[in-house]
Amino acid sequence: MILYGSYTSPFVRRIATTLKLYDLEFTNIELKTSNAAQLSELRSKNPLGRVPAFETDAGTLLIDSIAILDYLDRLVGIKKSLIPSDFEQRTTVMTQVGILNGAMEKTVSAVYEVEKRPEDKIHRPWLEQLHQQTKDGMEAVDNLAMTPWINGEKMTQADVSAVVFLDSIKQVRPNDMPSLECPKLVALSERANSLSAFSETYLERA
């Protein structure tokens, strides 16, 4: 299996961490959208030219991290999957993952707002709203979190997403924006990053 994209992307790192937690062998080919040559290769894997892209052992190409995670869950089966098979538990975890996805996507949009526009074209109210949405989403999950994992005794995909996304958000969140008040998720990140599946996929954004 091949995972395309850099671990500096939280969505790529989430897939890589999940693969490691599932003890699945894979190759990572680092393709960045900011590199013209690499972007051209990436488009041959994903017509949208975005990461992650994923190639199965059968040569099937998958795009979008949620679709890739669904494939991996089905590959390892319900006993090992980080998404519970129980209907109510599954709904809870998927709701949490949805909130976390949204929070991360708002931070990505905020980064693009600053990095892709001339300074005089940045719309400050929109930027502030994006960062507030990230804050609201992460704090909502923090308020729901139990211990040692978000849903109690067993790690789920909500934990993987929360750790990977919090680590990424902390790297790029401006000091002039309200800080995230997520003590439970901070503790979760510290604990999870002591595990090799997380530590081996952690990269600082340049």
Regions found by a protein language model. Name each.
Residues 69, 73, 94-97, 138, ...:
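Non-transmembrane alpha-helical segments in soluble domains
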Residues 1-124:
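GST-like domain detector, emphasizing the conserved glutathione-binding G-site
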Residues 9, 87, 156, 182-183, ...:
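Serine-centered coil/turn micro-motif
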Residues 135-138, 143, 193-206:
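Charged/polar, low-hydrophobicity segments characteristic of intrinsically disordered regions
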Residues 80-85, 149-153, 178-179, 199-204:
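Short, hydrophobic secondary-structure boundary micro-motifs
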Residues 100-190:
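GST-like fold's C-terminal all-alpha helical module
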